[in-house]
Amino acid sequence: MKQLLEFIPLILFFVVYKTYGVQEAALVLVAATVVQFIALQLLYKKIEKNQWIMGIAVVFFGLLTAYFNDLAFLKWKVTIVNAIFAVALLVSQYVFKKPLIQMLLGKELKLPQNVWEKLNLGWAGFFIFCMIINIIISEFFSDDVWANFKVFGLTGLSLIAVIGTGLYLYPHLKQLEQKEENNGNTN
């Protein structure tokens, strides 16, 4: 349900962009994002930090897009948000010496430090890749191509990254599970 709520503004943006235009789509995106935040607060009583970053960026750049009738602002949003996430992951690991991914998921998953570090770097690389490909597509292709990429390309890339993360973690989680079973059998 939560993931569906996160996709609704994007889907509405895409449909309105294809049928009406940039200004209308940007305004629908902003309105849907505000409604999404209200729904998240009512249903889950909490809005995550990454959702706040995305939501504030959507409202800010969406309103600029609507006001100036220029999709460039939403294109910049994708680049800027991906840059923020990549920098946050890298700073957490190299400045604060604790991967952000570990801070977010460390209570749910017990993994060796090197696995957390590789996972953190993998996601930083993913956000950098998305940032670069967004710049290329937004600068060298039409707005329609960019809108398709934003909705389908980035969503597909994100899905691939999540699946890749699962495949990377699977052997480590399996080892952990076996250790726990062995510890349980010796008691």
Curated annotation (Swiss-Prot):
Keywords: Cell inner membrane, Cell membrane, Membrane, Transmembrane, Transmembrane helix
Subcellular localization: Cell inner membrane
GO annotation, cellular component aspect: plasma membrane
Topology versus the membrane: Multi-pass membrane protein
Membrane-crossing residue ranges in chain numbering: 24-44, 53-73, 76-96, 121-141, 151-171
InterPro entries named in the record: YciB
Record's keyword annotation contains Kinase: no
Pfam families per the UniProt record, alphabetical: IspA
Family of the protein in this entry: Belongs to the YciB family.
Role description: Plays a role in cell envelope biogenesis, maintenance of cell envelope integrity and membrane homeostasis.
Name of this chain's protein: Inner membrane-spanning protein YciB
Organism: Glaesserella parasuis serovar 5 (strain SH0165) (Haemophilus parasuis)
Organism taxonomic ancestry: Bacteria, Pseudomonadati, Pseudomonadota, Gammaproteobacteria, Pasteurellales
